[in-house]
Amino acid sequence: MASTAHRQPSRPTTRQRQRTGRACEECRRRKLRCDGQQPRCGVCVDSGVTCEVNSQRRPRGPKKGYLTALRNRVAMLETRLPAQHLVGPLSEFNPLSTPLTNDHHDGCSVSSASSRSDSNPPPTVSEPDMSLPNTTTSVSSAPSFATCSKDIGGAEPITELVQAELNQLYFDRVHPSIQILHQRRYLGWARNAAKKTSRRCLQYAVWTLASLLSAQFQHLQDSFYQETKRTLEFSYLSGDSNAPVDTEEIQAWILIATYESMRTFHRSAWMSAGRAFRLVQLMRLHEIDSPTKPPVPEADLVETEEKRRVFWMAYFLDHLLSMRNNWPITLNEHVICTRLPAPDMEFQSGQPVLGAFLSEAIMDVMPQTTSPFNECVILATICGRSLFHAQQYSVRFVYGELAPNWTDQHQWLDNVLTNRLQILSQYYPSPTQICDPMLSFAHIMGQASVIHLYKGMASVVWAVDDGAWVVEYQRRALSAAQEIVKLAKGLTEFNFFKVCHTASLPCND
């Protein structure tokens, strides 16, 4: 009795919250709280056993990422359940619904993608495999996507709440840099279960970029990306070659090219952008405002403005890629009869604001409306002209047809660029004062244009008689490089998601 009374303080009636640390083996076996006293805990003293603590025991609980993968798998099964009743026996013939056994191609199962994201993150520097999944079903006999439910190939294991979050993430973090979607118009048809293939592709492209820029949904990006590419390719192979092209298909290719560039899949980004350029030409978006066309009805103003934005974004990407790689430009400015896009605020609110033509905007020293994206387009045009002049001069030199006015052309471009830099400083706020991704990129683009003009001159320096002129351009190029470094340091003060995502396409090497 005395010994029991003596040991009672070590076992209080009201136990406190278990201390941090490991319990002994006896307490674990009996599922009791261990007080952790040394050399023996209270339970071991009462039991008369040796108190042993195993310091090599693995931590309790499920493995990292297991619960997330389990939730995604449950959500996927919930989504597929109604789809099986809608699709019926056709689902087994869908080439995109067949699960792939190769881990490298397994992008349709989000549950597998989520489990991989916790242990082995996807590579960010290697080129992805763009081949279509192997199938024994011919393209002509495969069912149309229009007959399927909203689950494309079983790769949409997300609830309506997650869809809404991904859509909002896109317009919060992606749209400020790539302003090619009308938010109300997109959300209007995105909620409908029945969508045509091009809109499904665009929706998945939106989710691909949104998940890339999300900490919560990053494990879904590979699945969304693979499904978008496969659906785009399959719709091209199975569709009618004479069928009209939808704007949503071009928008999807532009977003996918941007995603691939951000993931450093540069060759794939170039190929995807090329598809967008050819579709832009096929839709003749370069002549939306041609005087030979009838006036646009008021009900179609938003749709027409969206087409303008798609064209100019494709034009902008074309020039950025050509500038970086010294490639010929695909979308030539001299055949464009499409007005520049209206400011995004007016576009989203549906106000009919008519932009200027490119040739007018380049020479306008007192712009009536301000748009950072339009400034980027104008600066890209100046660089494109410099690139074209340098390429043309090199070809003429080979054929012995030297143009005597190269210096005059370069001087004219330099004067136009100087005016645009002054407009940026006078009519727009400083990029350090306002967090606008397109405005920051416009300022960086302006300084990069100075460097690009110098590179164009350096490529044909043998054609320039005045050596002092070359030295002056070199000094200005060095000053522009220092200004870019200064602007880039200022971007570190902003949120990562507020940085312009087209900056992943470098203007210069």
UniProtKB/Swiss-Prot annotation:
Location in or out of the cell = Nucleus
Matches recorded under SUPFAM superfamilies: Zn2/Cys6 DNA-binding domain
Q: Residues annotated as DNA-binding region?
A: 24-51
Native organism taxonomy: Eukaryota, Fungi, Dikarya, Ascomycota, Pezizomycotina
Which Gene Ontology terms describe the biological processes this protein takes part in? DNA-templated transcription
Induction data: Expression is stimulated under green light conditions.
Gene Ontology cellular-component terms for this entry are: nucleus
A UniProt-annotated Pfam family: Zn_clus
Q: Which GO MF terms are attached to this record? A: DNA binding; DNA-binding transcription factor activity, RNA polymerase II-specific; zinc ion binding
Biased-composition ranges for Low complexity?
Answer: 109-119
Question: What are the record keywords, sorted?
Answer: DNA-binding, Metal-binding, Nucleus, Transcription, Transcription regulation, Zinc
Give the residue ranges for region: Disordered: 1-22, 97-143
> Its principal location?
nucleus
**What are the Polar residues biased-composition ranges?**
132-143
UniProt keyword annotation of Metal-binding present: yes
What protein does this entry describe? Citrinin biosynthesis transcriptional activator mrl3
Biological role? Transcription factor that regulates the expression of the gene cluster that mediates the biosynthesis of the mycotoxin citrinin, a hepato-nephrotoxic compound to humans due to inhibition of respiration complex III.
